[in-house]
Amino acid sequence: MPLESGKLINDLRVSELKTELEKRGLSTQGVKVVLTVRLNKALRDEGLDPADHVFEHAVSPMKKSTRRSNEMARAAAAAAAEKVEKGAGDEGNDENVLVEEKEEEEEEEDSHDLQIIEDHELEVPSDEKDDTLVEDEEFEEAEQVEPEPEAVEPVVEEKPEEKLEEKPEEKLEEKPEEKPVEPEVVTVEEPVAEVIEVEKAVAEPVELKEKPEKEPEVVLVEEPVEQLENEPEVVPMEVEEAKKSDEQDGEDEFEEDDSSSDIEIIEPTLQESEPLAEEKVEKKEKKPEEIPHNLEQNEPISMETEEKVEEEVIILNSSINNVSQDDEIVLDYEEDLLEDPLDEPIEQKEPKAAEPTPKQLQKVEASTPQATPSKAASSSAGSGKSMLFGDDVKKTSIWIRGMTPATKASSVKQLASQYGKVIQSKIFNSKAADANGDVKNCFALIQFADVTAMELAMTSLHQKNYQGRVLRVEKVSESHLTSSAEKLAREKHVAEAASTMSTSPAPTPTPEPVVTTTTTTSAAPKRKEPIHAPESSSSEGQRAKRRAIEAPVRSRSRSRGGGGEPRSSRKPITFDREEESNRDSRRTIAAAPPARTSRMARSPLRAPLRAARGSESSRSSTRGGGGGGESLTISSRVDTSGCRGGAIKRSVERSVPNNISTSELRRKHHQIHVTVQQDAPRASYQTEQYARERSSSTTTSSRRRQVSPDRSEQRRHRDEPPPRRAPQEQPSRRRGASPPEPPRRQEGARRSEEPERRRLFDEREQLAHIMAAKDMYAEQQKIRAEKALIAFQMQQLEKKKLEAELQIAQKALLMQQAALGGGGALVVDGGALVAGGGAVGYHHQEHRSSYGGGGSSSNGGSSNRRRQTRRSPSPPQQHHSSSRRQRRDSGGAGRYRQSTSSSNSNRNSNSGGRNLVVTATTTNNTNATNAGRSYGIQSVPDASSYSTNNYQQRSSAASAYDLQITATMPQAGAANSGAAYHQPYGNVYQHNTAAYPVWGGLDAQGHMAMDTNWSQNAATPSTSTSSGGGGGQQWQQQSYGSNQHQHHQNNNSSQPSSSNRRGNDYGNYRGNY
């Protein structure tokens, strides 16, 4: 190639810029501007001038190489589009071109490199000119190149419309053309770089939109084609094998037909429409992404086929002619199970529909509990393996005991689904039947998806009440029912395989699996041999005896004679098997004995005999169906093993119907009596609670066996064990009970230590009653103490209330004394204040004569009488002569007579004793103690009955009198600090009262002071008195005035003295002293 003279940095192309950057070990990513800046910086670091530096590069024929590279790229893209079977459109560039375009666009957003442009001096106008020149050249060349993809496009677009009709020969012809083309695209580097510059303006906006679709197609061209060509049948065969094994495992609970199909079940539509060769060709042409999609499309078809197979499955006949066992066999040790035909199959449809991939199919295969051997796999499968439980299945499966025989697998599945995902639910019935031949118990086998759901179901369902029964849950790995179920499944599969080989024709390669199943199903009712569960070694002897005993039939002579009168001579009994249906119509009367006796210990000698009678009665009850369901079954025992007629074991009395022996009847009669009265007569100390617990389960009996540690310790130190009462002594201790029964042989009789356990149980109950009584007595004592405390608090409150009333009365008395001190006498009568002395007393006397009605109690009212009933009447008034003399000296004779007469008339008119005459006087000592004495007080009425409202409403005269009183009240209230309350009455307070007996009042506890001097010469104040601001009052009186009178008493109050009812009565009986 000729060398170019030289170029400046602005004249370099993108490829040349990248070459220069590669030489210097710098990054080549980014657009031309970024590359130029990066190279400019590198030149400056080397000490060169980027503007003057000249670069030398080889000149390459751009146009020819560009066209040739475009042709090669378009040819490679067309070939790739034909392989992938998709139209490529206008995309004609190579993969490397798209990768470089993408790198250039990503680097346009590089902000770090763009910031460098500001730091360097670039001639942007010269770059723009060069770019426009290059773009013009590229646009001209692109116009010349454009017609070429138009010729290729129709060929590419027609490929998807042919609908995969190519033959594999065409693929083989096209493949050699690809291999020489693709290495040319990879090896040629410079033309590819030039294509970017040529088609930058035209192809860039188109390829940017289609690039996300273009890139995955080019990447997937080679590898998927090689997989499909090199391994055309690997993936479909894996799916087919997984599906086959899943179908075999999915139907393991039933006796279904074992014929399976390989390819036909998965893709039945392809079989009908196209030959097998074309199907293999299409498998080669499929992409790996479409394989799961095809499985999802074909999945419902295979599921429908399996549903048909399950509908026509051979179901094991559950009504096997088995001989019923004894009703009283403990079910905890039951090992013989029968599978219920109404089991629910494994949940294999939902995992198939939701998880169609081969790995998930393998997981479902591993989780299935059984494996039904097919015709091809039955010979290869090991017979030693367990057909029902695997190690993984045992970890997630549980047994549920105690379900009713009518339980269905769907209901069990619904019950267990609330705790987690249920994979399988099966129902097993026990072979033990009752007297009517019905199944006694039902066992459910449930397999969960994980161990967490199984543990949650165990904790939730154990001891749960379901359909009237208590469920018991066990793990499959720990239950003995697992071995019985495995034996049953193994026996069933072996018998089913043998019957299938004998009844069905040889296997043919016909593709109709449903038809083969139908032929197997049609042969199911023709099988006469019952399939028995494997017998345990312990019950072989019982089964041998049970088969030997057969039910006797009615004799011909008895049916001919119609059961006539009994004959005197015995004759051999003959039987006719033709009339077997009419045999025991009168004999079968009742059902099984009560459930309580089923847990008792059984005698080993009588168990086979009872089993024989139970089986015989069950057969006779199913044939005859006579009687009711609440009485006892009575049957005779006939041994027909040796001869046709047989012999009756017991002695026969002809008077008894149906030749029932009397000894058997007597023994049955005792059992009937036992059912009515289950327990023997008990002693008097035994309670009814023991009878209830005695009839319950074994948990109560174990609780009764527990003895308290204290009693056990006491018993160890005793020399002799506690005496035991014999069972014969018990009836004698119970009075009024029914006569005792004769000693009888009954199974499950009480052990000898039963009375001792009863005594211990009752002693514990008595101790509990005593402790409860003690607790109740303690509670009652506590309640009594609380009541006493409440009563005491009420008395205290009442006491405080009386104290407050007395304090208010004291204040009122003080105000009355200050207002009426001139007269020296104060009469309080029914709410009316009467004062002696001057015109006031006269006016009031006039008022009393005019309104009192001549001694009538007009001012009392009904309220005074109501108050009279509440308190005891006050004693009659007693005035000492000294007090009368004091009144005469202080107030004058005339005024004294008026006030006394008015008070006497009021006292006589009001018979209720509600008049209170207060003769008050105070003294002002020189030492300023101001301890005013009050005496002559009668009773202490309530303030409510002496309100002045009634007094104010009587007349205008009464109101005028109140005004006279209230006119003096402010003056009295203003003079509450010194000697006299009012100046006009100052002489009264200066009067000497030392000669009169004075009572100091009650102390703080409501009692009379011990230091009170009752002599006339010594009137020392009591230690309990207290002096207030305006003179301490030792007697506290009820408030008789209105709120006006009480308003001025605030500063004269002394501390209240405590008083109770007895202290309050001192005012009644000691008021005159």
Swiss-Prot record:
- The domain of life for this entry's organism is Eukaryota
Upon gene disruption, the observed phenotype is: Viable, but have an extended lifespan. There is a decrease in early progeny production, resulting in smaller self-fertile brood size, and an increase in late progeny production, which results in an extended self-fertile reproductive lifespan. Defective pharyngeal grinder positioning, which results in feeding defects. Animals also have protruding male spicules.
Q: Which Pfam families match?
A: RRM_1 (PF00076), SAP (PF02037)
* GO biological process assignments: digestion; regulation of mRNA processing; regulation of transcription by RNA polymerase II
Which Gene Ontology cellular component annotation is one that this UniProt entry carries? nucleus
What residue spans carry the region label Disordered? 59-186, 207-305, 337-388, 481-759, 845-917, 1015-1073
Listed name of the protein = Pharyngeal muscle protein 2
Q: What is the lineage of its organism?
A: Eukaryota, Metazoa, Ecdysozoa, Nematoda, Chromadorea
